[in-house]
């Protein structure tokens, strides 16, 4: 009987561990979903700022015809 009780205790312990691990996996999944959402948002912002930077750069650069010659000419 001791062996059977030991086995039942081990099974109960394993069931407890599995339940705990299921809970941890679910929590980690929620954190991962949140991080993916934040990452997507940051990537969108980086693309937006990169485009904005390109537009600012191209609008501030004058063509060679528009440039005034240096003072030594």
Swiss-Prot record:
Family membership noted in the UniProt record: Belongs to the SlyX family.
Originating gene: slyX
Alphabetized Pfam families for the sequence: SlyX
NCBIfam families for the chain: PRK02119.1
Identification of the protein by name: Protein SlyX homolog
InterPro entries with a match to the protein in the record: SlyX
């Amino acid at each position: 009987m001791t062996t059977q009780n030991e086995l039942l205790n081990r099974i109960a312990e394993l069931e407890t561990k599995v339940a705990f691990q299921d809970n941890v996996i679910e929590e980690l999944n929620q954190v991962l979903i949140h991080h993916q959402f934040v990452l997507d948002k940051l990537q969108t912002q980086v693309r937006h700022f990169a485009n904005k930077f390109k537009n600012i750069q191209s609008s501030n650069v004058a063509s060679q015809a528009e440039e005034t010659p240096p003072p030594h000419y």
